[in-house]
């Protein structure tokens, strides 16, 4: 995925009301740009952070600029636009770059599924094999207090993410393939695990989903201010939080 037109940069002043971000440009001008990320954005949104933003030519948009990339104090690039996770995942699947998700004839998006009025991010289909339901999650939280390069998801309590795990388990029980695909959009993350210290319920559901046969994949594209392209899978470390006797 190439950023076209090229991204512009500035310095973060503040993020507020979840979706708004004030940025000071190099010429001193201050602009307000849209932030698509509703999470805590820990380590991504500190005042003074160098940021890059895209510009839309859609005249109907109230805010034409969107926050795309942040640069951490350590020099890591972080894609904070959560919509990009689905976009790059789809592109990589169509390119055949995600080996476990190849071999399907059709790819559809936002298809209704499950028992809780959900829509699947990506649905892979092919004659003669089970459908493959893929939920995509964007990972940007780096916390190196326990291990260098350790990433976590979620960065805030996520009822929506819990619902998606339940839906994936329903699909697996119905005989389909169910995949939770973590798109790791922080260049400093080299391994990841569930954030039990932030959302223990979600971590428990991950353990239940693994036991039920849901596949967990963690893919880290190369994140830069010009493009995001294929790179590598990284390890996922389970927390083993299931209480004794849980199913």
From Swiss-Prot:
Belongs to the SfsA family. GO terms for molecular function: DNA binding. This is Sugar fermentation stimulation protein homolog. PANTHER family: SUGAR FERMENTATION STIMULATION PROTEIN A. It comes from Aeromonas salmonicida (strain A449). It holds the Pfam family SfsA. InterPro entries: SfsA, SfsA_C, SfsA_N.
